[in-house]
From Swiss-Prot:
Reactions performed catalytically: iminosuccinate + dihydroxyacetone phosphate = quinolinate + phosphate + 2 H2O + H(+)
Keyword field contains Transferase: yes
Xref: NCBIfam families: nadA, PRK09375.1-2, PRK09375.1-4
Source organism superkingdom: Archaea
Entry keywords, A to Z: 4Fe-4S, Cytoplasm, Iron, Iron-sulfur, Metal-binding, Pyridine nucleotide biosynthesis, Transferase
Pfam families per record: NadA (PF02445)
GO cellular component, one term: cytoplasm
Family: Belongs to the quinolinate synthase family. Type 2 subfamily.
Tagged with keyword Transferase: yes
Protein name: Quinolinate synthase 1
UniProt binding sites for [4Fe-4S] cluster: C86, C171, C259
Length: 304
């Protein structure tokens, strides 16, 4: 089927199913273009709650679909590619987290939304890269357990007086972005601003002109007087950057800055999910209720 025919059929089924399509910025360009809403993890969580559709088709990885199912239990949540798991989310396990909690009984668990529903259920509050600092600083404690990303934990630790007890996880895509990659790109494009995601290594963030979530990176590039930008995150964001500020130039930091899991969803799989209503994301109710408490606490935190 030609792309135009795929798009037409998806649009028809979307109306028939009363469905809404949500996509992360790291998805394929054609998937972002057909989505009703494209955003970062925080915005997508908020949008899942706002939408009054019967069906949410989540173009992203498994934990994103789970978050939508947790927050909107009466809606049917579809994940076009059921095997699109997040490697970082898989780096933390429930039993290991329970043992860490036993070692630090006074420290609440702050879980990055890039985690499974089971991990969220073991957490006091969730966070995203857009609100991690505000979430941690909102807690009236001296120390927190932060899972699963050690790089985001280090970024938060540099912006709070609280002791951060990190889990030893990381995003493989961001962790592969090296300091020498940045220095080479800066030498090649001396006028370009380097904007980076806080999942990057600390020594990479030291070189950044601005550190932000994907949405924050887009807003910075759009509002900056600079004309060129080196992009320190998954290169799918460049599509969103071009749409927000097409007159500017963007350079992908590295050929390795590509998340295979985020690229698994394509138009064919999106169509199949709507046609067959397949790959429904479900979360056991006992887990869902506990995980929702952590997500609700996050959504109540005010972000500057």
């Amino acid at each position: 089927m030609q792309q135009a025919d795929l798009i037409k059929r998806i649009q028809e089924l979307k109306v028939k199913r009363n469905a809404v399509i949500l996509s992360h910025y790291y998805s394929r360009p054609e998937v972002q273009d057909i989505a009703d809403f494209v955003g970062d993890s925080l915005a997508l969580s908020q949008e899942a709650v706002r939408q009054d559709a019967d069906v949410i088709v989540f173009c992203g990885v498994h934990f994103m679909g789970e978050s939508a199912a947790i927050l909107s239990p009466k809606k049917t949540v579809l994940l076009p590619e059921i095997d699109s798991t997040c490697p970082m989310a898989d780096m933390v396990d429930v039993e290991g987290l329970k043992r860490l909690k036993e070692k630090h009984p006074e420290a609440p668990v702050v879980s990055y939304v890039n985690s499974s529903a089971a991990i969220k259920a073991e957490s006091y509050i969730c966070c995203t890269s857009a609100n991690a600092v505000e979430v941690v600083n909102s807690l009236d404690v001296d120390e927190v357990i932060f899972v699963p990303d050690k790089n985001l934990a280090a970024y938060v630790a540099s912006r709070t007086d609280k002791k951060i007890i990190p889990w030893e996880g990381h995003c493989p895509t961001h962790h592969q972005i090296l300091r020498e990659d940045v220095l080479k790109m800066k030498e090649k494009h001396p006028l370009a601003k380097f904007i980076a995601h806080p999942e990057c290594r600390p020594d990479v963030l030291e070189l950044a002109d601005h550190v932000a979530s994907t949405r924050g990176m887009i807003m910075y590039a759009k509002n900056s007087p600079a004309r060129e930008f080196i992009i320190g995150t998954e290169c799918g964001l460049i599509h969103g950057l071009h749409k927000a500020a097409p007159e500017k130039t963007y350079y992908c930091i590295s050929e390795f800055a590509c998340c295979p899991s985020m690229k698994m969803v394509n138009l064919e799989k999106l169509l199949a999910s709507l046609e067959k209503m397949q790959h429904v994301v479900t979360v056991p109710e006992e887990v869902r209720v506990r995980a929702k408490e952590a997500l609700d606490r996050m959504l109540a935190v005010k972000v500057k």
